[in-house]
Design a protein with these regions (language model features):
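Glycine/proline-rich low-complexity spacer/linker segments in large multi-domain proteins
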Residues: 1-9, 58-112, 179
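A surface-exposed beta-strand-loop module
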Residues: 2-75, 148-152
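Generic secondary-structure boundary/loop-capping signal
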Residues: 2-5, 36, 75-81, 121, ...
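Polar low-complexity intrinsically disordered regions enriched in Ser/Thr and small residues
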Residues: 14-17, 72, 78, 97, ...
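A structural detector for beta-sheet-dominated domains
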Residues: 19, 24, 31, 40-42, ...
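Short structured motifs
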Residues: 36-42, 96-101, 144
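Short, surface-exposed linear patches
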Residues: 44, 61-62, 74-81, 135-140, ...
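Hydrophobic helix-coil surface modules that form long, contiguous segments used
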Residues: 86-94, 102-182
């Protein structure tokens, strides 16, 4: 893997840059150490409590080498796993800040709300449940509880909810077709 990565051009290498992180709406101080982002919490997160963690980040989708990327060998435009900043798990043994270097990881289970804005010619398959079929079309509108209302412009925003999952994975391609049977 390292040989393939070292041969990539700058526009083919993936990266993520966290712009800011909020816990329950409050901005937190962060420091990056290679693939680890340390967060200095303004208040402790108590055991069995719930918090809302929001990240604003920029990323470049790499040419697919392993789990995630663009233009894979099967011809799929985007295959996206491990594509967002992941939280380290804290358990009975302490923190698990395992760096992401092409190996397995230890991660948090959680509830995801994900919005993906992409060219409207693409169809997305993603973890969880599509929340806005009435805006998407591509065959999903027949499952909508609201009347079909096509979005104006060249993009669509697909809104997913995925409860109690380990990762949010998605794939998108203009050649994908949504088929269903009843």
């Amino acid at each position: 893997v390292r040989d393939r990565i070292s041969n990539l051009k700058p526009n083919e290498i993936g990266f993520q840059e966290v712009k800011n992180l909020r816990v329950n709406g409050q901005l937190q101080k962060t420091t990056a150490y290679e693939t680890i982002l340390k967060v200095e919490l303004s208040k402790p997160i108590l055991p069995k409590s719930k918090v809302l963690i929001e990240l604003d980040f920029e990323a470049q989708v790499p040419v697919q080498i392993r789990r995630s990327g663009r233009d894979n060998a099967e011809g799929v435009r985007f295959s996206m796993a491990q594509w967002y900043p992941k939280l380290a798990e804290y358990d009975q043994q302490g923190w698990h800040p395992t760096p992401y270097v092409a190996r397995e990881f230890y991660g948090v289970w959680g509830d995801f709300e994900v919005n993906i804005t992409i060219d409207k010619n693409y169809v997305i398959g993603g973890t969880g449940y599509l929340q806005n079929p009435h805006e998407i079309g591509h065959g999903y509108e027949k499952y909508a509880t609201l009347p079909f209302k096509p979005t104006q412009g060249n993009t669509l925003t697909w809104k997913f909810k995925a409860p109690n999952v380990h990762d949010f994975v998605w794939a998108a391609d203009p050649g994908y077709v949504h088929n269903s049977k009843q």
